Regions:
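Small-residue (G/A/S/T)-rich helix-start motifs and N-terminal tracts that mark the onset
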Residues: 1-133, 142-159, 164-231
């Protein structure tokens, strides 16, 4: 059971998460369990998109589509033929896919370059109109610190999932400053971006406008490349 540490901070474990996963009806079909769009995988980092899309499927999404660089399509289909894959050369290719999902993940394997920047900019412009759940991770978080994104208004159904280094960039402080007071850092990020914050690391912190949750699980087993792309 979720344990209160203070009136505003609650501790949770994997058991708490498991209890809140809805049970599926025997008559359920793929259309009952959501359509997830994963926007990920710039040149040379197709694996990040492939792993993110695969983890979405394993987490229970009924349908998953990966939007990535065209050169990664064949690798994705070879590994996960059940995941739909679309190639994107520019922001127009993204717009054609935005009417389909009811949840979006963007950022794994994206970088500070023109392709990633135009894709993320178009996404943020369009989803503020739709207000569907969007999770931003990795390269998307770095891009949020760019001047071009400084006046973007993010809605409160968005989730930002920085590790300490990304959080430091977002708050313009050192990583040591983030780690010194992780709860306060998460609160500052929430206030700055008006989103749900998941500050990753030992004792992952989830922070929204009203409450803070502290994860009691986790360890050094996750300290390998790729785990961030599936979290």
């Amino acid at each position: 059971m979720t344990k209160k540490i203070t009136p505003l901070i609650k501790e949770f474990s994997f058991k708490d998460i498991k209890r809140n996963i809805p049970k599926r009806k025997n008559s359920a079909h793929k259309g009952d369990h959501g359509k997830l769009l994963v926007i990920a995988g710039d040149e040379g980092f197709g694996g990040a998109g492939i792993m993110s899309a695969e983890s979405g499927l394993k987490a229970g999404a009924g349908l998953v589509r990966l939007l990535t660089r065209k050169l990664h399509i064949s690798a994705s289909l070879a590994r996960n033929p059940e995941i739909m894959v679309s190639g994107a050369d520019n922001a127009q290719d993204l717009e054609e896919n935005l009417s389909w999902p009811n949840a979006i993940v963007a950022g794994p394997g994206m970088f500070e370059n023109f392709w990633s920047e135009q894709i993320l900019f178009k996404l943020l412009v369009k989803i503020t109109e739709k207000k569907i759940p969007v999770l931003l991770d990795a390269g998307a978080l770095r891009l949020l610190t760019y001047k071009a994104f400084s006046k973007m208004k993010l809605h409160d159904q968005m989730v930002l999932t920085p590790h300490p280094g990304e959080a430091a960039d977002m708050l313009k402080v050192s990583t040591q400053e983030i780690q010194k007071n992780r709860i306060e850092s998460a609160k500052k990020l929430q206030k700055k971006y008006n989103c749900i914050i998941v500050l990753k690391g030992q004792g992952t912190i989830i922070c929204n406008k009203k409450e803070i949750y502290l994860c009691a699980s986790g360890g050094p087993e996750l300290a390998v490349a790729g785990t961030g792309d599936i979290l």
